[in-house]
Amino acid sequence: MNSLRPLTRYDAVAMSLHWVIALLILLDFALAMSFSQFDPGDVLYLPSAYDLHMAVGMCVLGLSVARVIWRLTHRRPPLPDMALPLRWLACASHFLLYVFMVLAPVSGWLVLSLRHQVTSVFGLFRWAWPSLPAIAHMARPERAFWHDHLLPLHVQISYVGMCLVALHVTAALYHHFVRRDGVLVRMLPLRTLRRGKHSPAGERTTTPLTPESPS
């Protein structure tokens, strides 16, 4: 049966979630890095940038939860043939990436809850994000105390997460250009995005570059 055959590529939903989340994470990190480049009193840029950062972060959270659920309920291609320590490292790095994709926006949500701040959602409407239950009834001094401690934690989580992203990208490029085992191309939506077809054994063929036919 086809359902029992080894998978060679990720399905369309997994690929879509992967690339959309990746782009949103890079956008959100770039926005966060831009905050320090402007004067705190810049009323033209900073409020809109903060609002966009928060809205994108919430999108990352929702899509990451969907990605985790999809990952747990659907098959994926097996890891390539490599040494056991490298397989452990690959599994650990993927697990930590999932933790980062959820923990970074949740920690940001905690900071936002402590502010009781109304934000613009992509310029479409203004909305006060729901406060998490443990924070909703805190007194102002207590909220200020936790805000001053959680905001640096949110920043540190983001930096660690971007290091994981850099490691993930480096590993993907290593598999593609050094090992040539097809790990990268199985997450690409179109064959036209690659320079040839990689077999599971790492051998390269010269099949025509055509869009993937629908299954």
Predicted regions and their residues:
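Membrane-embedded alpha-helical bundles that constitute the cytochrome b-like, heme-associated redox core
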Residues: 1-215
